[in-house]
């Protein structure tokens, strides 16, 4: 096979990681295959030595950050200086994932699976970095490909040896600080922390289409915690203090404001706080508990799920009872199940965005009470708060004033900046507004 020819001719290559060249790994881990455009893709494991890597031994808990930084430095050479061209597929459109930048590590979702990133085949150990190189060659002759691989490896070896170790140490410390703060949330009575100067806005590309792995937007308005919310300051493990907004345990925290002000973007950044980020991502110190659930509208086939926290009766066509539902769930039933399951599982933080929600489950109306027998989240907060258990809620609202009024604390976004929302004043204004509406409906002045 072609890959065997390449490997046989690479026997003199000192960087080839032959320990992985087993029969069981052939055509799975390492291979050579023709691409749709006629080019040849060769994937092989290599190992490069740098004695300076030994200085990272003190920072093993952040070693994945140092590894990813090495990979990103190689990518920047590719992008800015047009070096290591086989690793870029000579910039062919279908090969963008090979050199697309990435500023996220330790993401628990299989996002960007085709991006070059730290994993069990790309890592630093001792004085060596192990890299799985995905190379594209226009040539079809195995000897010519081997010649180019040897040149690439020699070039990479020289480049890796010149990467400043302080850059890698700083990145390892950065990851350790994020893990340290996430571990400290419980002790601080928090489920989330948003540091001042964080930059939540994301720039999406053909390859990075999900907010968890997208890079920072070029124009990015930093987050600043309003002083009225009493920002907290936290000292990190490695010589740095961060100040910002802490979301408390069992808190109902509201993010509101007009459309297109960054509410959903901020909520997505909070969700991304479960991951660790490289220096420059902008979300390094948006730190969130990993015990998190998102509730949104949708549909599913139910087979005994419990939604009795919200539903007193079931709509026609749905079998069972609110405690054991059978049939195709509506959007509100599905969302009710998500929230109730999260509470039952003692999930520490539940995220809700009005734009992706069944509104009748968040705030009840007269008709929903008549026809659906739904007890909304707003009613539960007012009357049965204890049924929400120990879960905190961060809820993005725009038009759901009643739910906003029931929050413990709130911010509104204006010009993409966080402003303090005085909920005491807001409740008074909302009460007057409701009285005014009621007076108009029944034609009688209702006194405050």
Swiss-Prot record:
Cross-referenced Pfam families: ABC_ATPase, ABC_N
Organism phylogeny: Archaea, Methanobacteriati, Methanobacteriota, Methanomada group, Methanococci
SUPFAM superfamilies, sorted: P-loop containing nucleoside triphosphate hydrolases
Residues reported to bind ATP: 257-264
Protein name: Uncharacterized protein MJ1628
Keyword Calcium attributed: no
CDD domains listed in its UniProt record: ABC_ATPase
UniProt GO MF annotations: ATP binding
Keyword ATP-binding: yes
Keywords: ATP-binding, Nucleotide-binding
């Amino acid at each position: 096979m072609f890959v065997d020819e390449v490997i046989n001719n690479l026997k003199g290559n000192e960087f080839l990681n032959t320990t992985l060249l087993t029969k069981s790994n052939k055509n799975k881990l390492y291979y050579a295959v023709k691409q749709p455009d006629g080019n040849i893709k060769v994937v092989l494991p290599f190992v490069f030595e740098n004695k300076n890597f030994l200085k990272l031994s003190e920072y093993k808990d952040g070693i994945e950050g140092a590894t990813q930084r090495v990979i990103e430095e190689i990518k920047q050479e590719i992008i800015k200086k047009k070096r290591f061209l086989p690793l870029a597929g000579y910039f062919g459109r279908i090969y963008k994932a090979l050199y697309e930048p990435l500023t996220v590590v330790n993401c628990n979702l299989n996002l960007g699976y085709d991006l070059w990133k730290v994993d069990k085949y790309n890592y630093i150990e001792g004085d060596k970095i192990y890299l799985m190189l995905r190379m594209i060659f226009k040539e079809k002759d195995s000897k010519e490909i081997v010649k180019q691989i040897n040149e690439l490896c020699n070039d990479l070896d020289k480049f890796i040896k010149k990467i400043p170790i302080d850059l890698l140490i700083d990145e390892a410390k950065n990851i350790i600080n994020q893990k340290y703060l996430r571990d400290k949330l419980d002790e601080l009575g928090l489920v989330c922390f948003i540091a001042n100067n964080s930059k939540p806005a994301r720039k999406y590309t053909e390859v990075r289409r999900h907010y968890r792995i997208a890079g920072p937007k070029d124009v990015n308005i930093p987050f600043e915690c309003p002083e009225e919310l009493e920002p907290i300051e936290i000292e990190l493990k490695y010589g740095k203090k961060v100040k910002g907004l802490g979301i408390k345990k069992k808190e109902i925290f509201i993010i509101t404001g007009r459309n297109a002000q960054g509410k959903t973007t901020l909520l997505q950044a909070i969700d991304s706080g479960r991951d660790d980020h490289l220096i420059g991502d902008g979300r390094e110190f948006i730190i969130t508990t990993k015990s998190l659930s998102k509730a949104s509208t949708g549909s599913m086939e139910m087979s005994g799920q419990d939604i009795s926290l919200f539903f007193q009766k079931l709509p026609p066509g749905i079998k069972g009872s609110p405690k054991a539902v059978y049939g195709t769930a509506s959007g509100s039933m599905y969302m009710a199940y998500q929230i109730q399951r999260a509470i039952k599982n003692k999930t520490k933080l539940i995220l809700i965005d009005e734009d992706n929600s069944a509104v009748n489950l968040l705030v009840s109306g007269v008709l929903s009470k008549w026809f659906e027998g739904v007890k909304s989240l707003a009613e539960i907060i007012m009357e049965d708060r204890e049924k929400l258990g120990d879960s905190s809620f961060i809820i993005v609202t725009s038009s759901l004033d009643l739910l906003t009024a029931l929050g413990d604390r709130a911010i509104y976004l204006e010009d993409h900046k966080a402003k303090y929302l005085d909920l005491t004043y807001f409740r008074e204004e909302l009460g007057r507004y409701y009285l005014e509406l009621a007076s108009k409906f029944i034609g009688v002045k209702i006194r405050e």
